[in-house]
Amino acid sequence: ILNYFKNEDLSENIAFIESIDDKNDEILIKYYFNDVNHKTKILLDNEVAIIKHSKIRQYDLLDKVFLYEKRIWLKLKNDTKTLDIFINSQKLKLVFNDRCINDLSLVLKVLAKQKKQRSKNSNLWLFADMSWRADDNAEHLYRYIMQNHPKQKTAFILSKNSTDYLRLKKEGFRLVDPKGFYFKYLIYKADKIISSHIDKYIFNALGGDTLKTKDFIFLQHGVIKDDLSRWLNQRKIDTFITSTKAEYESIAGDFNHYKFSTKEVVLTGLARWDALIKNNVLNTKQILIMPTWREYLSGKVQKYGVRARNSEFVKSLYFQKWQEFLCSKELEKLAVRYGYNIIFTPHPQVKIYLEDFNLPSYIITSYKESMQELFCKSSLMITDYSSVAFEMAVLKKPVLYYQFDKDEFFAKHSYAKGYFDYEKDGFGEVCFNYEQLLFCLKNILNHNDKKKDSCILISQNICKDIFKKCKL
């Protein structure tokens, strides 16, 4: 605090051993500082240590930099005894598990214990999208591995009540219900958990240390464009998939709020993009309306991540603005005049409120068709802040953003505005009111819009690239 308000040096010079990577014999050390030009010297057994990965994480207070955190991954040898860290020639105290230590004997004991625990893992990879729904990156990567690497032991976590369950079972997926004891047994035995989400039912399946000696590969649900650090920093992520250079740098780079570095973050693209590009359909006449959710409108969390209904939802600006647009005569006239079908598929959390919208009969609301099919068969998308716009950018199809609640959205969500500027970096016009949205939509249908080029570079073998990263 004194450093922030009076620009005084940090008086407590301590380095912490935060984490142990028992698979690679590496430890994560961190310390805090305010002088970005400070000099660091790290010695292992009196020899200059080789830094495997490093990161400068930034903490802000009142829109100003509060302090910095240096995060460094070091490689240990079996007989490493001492670790000495110097900042501007001043030696730092070393703390591990809330204890000051003079050598690495305790660290090596914990390392050996974790190795022993990891040795009990079988070569099983557990996949998951949402507990009650598939059709995301985990499904696509699982299918690739099932078809191209059949010897790899795999299982896919999915509720028996899911509408995707029978479809995947017929295809040959090995499915396990998250409510059963067998699911917990497989979590215990698995070596890798590979998921597009970071749900508690996985991370806490066997208690807080469920994934301590297992690899968690985060496939992501979409492309991160906002600052999700407050949420994601709570999780242990061993491999963090990203899709664009800007996204990669915003997470793995220095002077941001994420704890993750080049050790965890990799740039591959999303697993589902292989099939997306392959199955793209041109010259269609379909408008896909796909707004994201507002977490602050959610009901209480029930088991397995399912939300209860919020009785106040219909009073929200979100409901009122989308209903105004969807039920407008102007939208219907445009659809009829230009011969377009309109599909309304909002975030899955909206599904329980669909009847409240009282939509006209010509608007289709179906969750039976896969997300992939919707993107491929649609000719343009209307969304708000959702990263699904990147799917259309990959397919080089136009997007409109409807952001009537811009200030409220970023003020109330668990994440802050990130590197992505919708007006500068987005894939189409940003509209802030109903009239502007209709005007921009008419321009696109009239072919009077100015198309924005997508800067997304796509690999031809994304699933193959991710599989290689999972094998590491």
For every predicted segment, state its role.
Residues 1-126, 151:
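Basic, ligand-binding patches in group-transfer machinery
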Residues 135-150, 271-356, 429-431:
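Conserved catalytic-core segment of nucleotide-activated headgroup transferases in glycan assembly
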Residues 176-190, 343, 348-390:
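Donor nucleotide-activated moiety binding/catalytic core segment of transferases
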